[in-house]
Amino acid sequence: MKHIFFIDLDNTIYFTKPNEEQLMSELYRYLESLDLGISDEKFQLAKEEMLRTPFVKVAKKYGFKEEIMPEVISYLHNREVTKPLKPSDDYHYIKSLNGRKFIVTAGFPKQQTSKVKMLGIADDFEAVHVVDVSTTNKKEVFKLLIDRYDLNTDDILIIGDDAESEIKFGLELGIATFLLDPENLHPNAESTFRGTDLSNLHTAAGQ
């Protein structure tokens, strides 16, 4: 039975699309006020991707002007979500897991911790760990948590939606993974368990 859980935040505990207004409207307005050096069409595509991919990765992919990036990064470091967010309809499957639960999320610390606060779920988790993807990745943070809390990898299940991040890194460390893939974006990705929702999460955890 698994009784330690490393859980992603964005598009796992809650979905960004239904919360887009609260999460993104202010950021979109800010970016529209800048000369990003890309076409409107590319900006629309970038906005879509921002809902599921860390901002720095999106900016790199779509070629945002490098000279404006320090200003944008500074803005994002100081940004907080201040309106209530709604957890996913399946969140009760996560909440009812027995054991120690850690949120491991990529992004900007102030922004990510404010999301947890606005979701009203902070008390459901032992700790929240925000990964700065510009300097490290989730694999290094998983290793850090295992060492810090003296955890056995056989007891851990990693839950998330990113096949190229938490799922891939979990498997590389020999840890069981649950890939949440509602839109079947990763049909060929490796994962110990997978689902279009979280209804079989307890079975995967052996609970």
Where are these regions (language model features)?
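Conserved phosphate-coupling serine/threonine residues in phosphotransfer and NTP-handling enzymes
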Residues: T105-G107
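A metal-dependent, Asp-based hydrolase signature
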Residues: Y30-L34, Q44-R79
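Short, acidic loop-to-helix structural element flanking the phosphoryl-transfer center
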Residues: N78-I103, K139
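Active-site neighborhood of HAD-like aspartate-dependent phosphohydrolases
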Residues: M1-D40
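Asp-based, Mg2+/Mn2+-dependent phosphohydrolase catalytic module
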Residues: M1-H3, F102, Q111-Q207
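Alpha-helix C-terminal capping segments
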Residues: F43-K47, A59-Y62, D89-G99, P187-A189, ...
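Solvent-exposed loop/turn and edge beta-strand elements of beta-rich ligand-binding domains
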Residues: G37-D40, I68, F125, L179
